[in-house]
Design a protein with these regions (language model features):
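Active-site mouth loops of central-metabolism enzymes
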Residues: 40-56, 101-113, 169-187, 266-286
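Active-site beta-loop-alpha junctions enriched in small/polar residues
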Residues: 45-48, 75-79, 104-110, 135-137, ...
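Catalytic domains of carbohydrate-active enzymes, especially glycoside hydrolases
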Residues: 59-75, 197
Length: 332
């Protein structure tokens, strides 16, 4: 396979809608029911910040290998050693495990030249599946977004750039409740359709807790563009394991936890959240299981879990949903 375009100028014109990437399965190709009848699932990892965090990530990766996820994704750590560690660990996941690996790529604070270089690094590691995002300002997701003077303004532009660089499968983000920077849901849906028309093959949602928001998103995309509306929208969820993780969940979802769910967690916590932490965790697992089951019932193409580099809570939810674990990691 030629990598000639990866670090050079992009190929003009619209990329083909169904890229042929020799030797690298696409995410869409993985979205078929498993032999046991369950729908595909996938997991998200975060770049490890130090050696201890990296060891924890690898333990989680080996645990998930035993459940045969359709793919794993690695979020993007921008800048300095975090960026370098992200690229290295993402490449190792692709080379040293059986896990189909998706690398996140964000436009924020990068020039086009830097973005091309990052894509080239992933290509050199054999990674041909990218999740393309505009990204939030580091340190303040709600802060003012500023385009790099030599960078890109919109995720749609980044999709076109990546597709013009060579053989890549591209996914994008979608937002069941709308992105906080979008003026309204109709405009937000139009942005998603533009990213799909630019060459994205699927989207992964921002985390949410109300399945109806996901269903309404699907309907909006079909109404916006019936052709692009046929592309998979993979829902993202995260088990809440303590009251402390509620704040993290709200940051990731961009919305407050629904009152009915918060009440269930607070009831389990009682007057002593620390003493009742196991009860709170059990309710969090129960809530994630309920959300996952409804998504399955509503025909979701897969389930994508935020793991924070821990396997236990997600594997418990998956077990509740009927997924099985093999005796040993498949690449051990």
């Amino acid at each position: 396979m030629s990598f000639d375009n990866v670090r050079g100028r992009s190929t003009p014109g619209r990329p083909s809608r169904t890229p042929q990437v020799s030797g690298t399965p696409s995410i869409v190709e993985q979205l078929v029911r498993r032999p046991d009848g369950t729908i595909p699932f996938s997991v998200e990892f975060n770049p490890p910040r130090d050696a201890a965090a990296e060891a924890r990530l690898w333990r989680a990766a080996r645990e998930f290998e035993r459940m045969h996820p359709a793919f794993v994704s690695m979020t993007y750590g921008a800048g300095g050693s975090t960026r370098d560690r992200t690229a290295r660990v993402t490449g190792q996941l692709a080379r040293e495990t059986t896990l189909l690996t998706v690398a996140h790529l964000t436009a924020v604070e990068h020039s086009v030249a830097e973005l091309r270089s990052i894509v080239g690094t992933y290509a050199d590691a054999g990674i041909r599946n990218l999740l393309v995002l505009r990204g939030d300002p580091p340190g303040d997701p709600l802060g003012e977004w500023r385009k790099h003077p030599e960078g890109l303004e919109y995720a749609e532009e980044l999709v076109r750039m990546v597709r013009g660089l060579g053989d890549f499968h591209v996914g994008v983000a979608s937002f069941p409740q709308g992105h906080h920077r979008s003026p309204d849901l109709d405009r937000d849906t139009a942005y998603l359709c533009a990213k799909l028309r630019a060459g994205a093959e699927y989207s992964i949602t921002q985390m949410f807790f109300d399945v109806d928001d996901y269903l309404r998103l699907r309907d909006r995309v079909v109404a916006c563009d019936p052709v692009e509306g046929a592309k998979p929208i993979i829902p993202e969820l995260m088990p809440i394991t303590s009251l402390r993780t509620v704040q993290r969940a709200e940051e990731l979802s961009g919305r407050p936890l629904p009152a009915r769910l918060l009440q269930r967690l607070e009831k389990a916590a009682g007057n002593d959240p620390e003493a009742n932490r196991n009860a709170v965790r059990a309710v969090g697992i129960e809530i994630a299981t309920e959300i996952g089951q409804r998504l399955i019932d509503e025909g979701a193409p897969g389930l994508h879990f935020i793991t924070l580099n821990f396997a236990k809570a997600t594997t418990e939810v998956l077990t509740n949903l009927g997924y099985t674990v093999t005796a040993t990691p498949v690449s051990a």
